[in-house]
């Protein structure tokens, strides 16, 4: 059952970040850049796309304190990790 649960979380995250999500939200790296630019303007502190992936993961971790059994938190964290790596690569360009 445990392996099945792990697989389910990863498959759901894959579906979220590798499917038609771009049609609704645009490319994740472009979306993270938009968010980083807004945060930078709001806080007057430089943020990167990779920062967005990390901070959104932290939002999910904070929510897990209240509701640790909500599968969506784990799925989203896996998705942010998957988008974070190419975001970090794009930041380095």
Locations of regions flagged by a protein language model:
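Intrinsically disordered, low-complexity regulatory regions
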Residues: 1-93
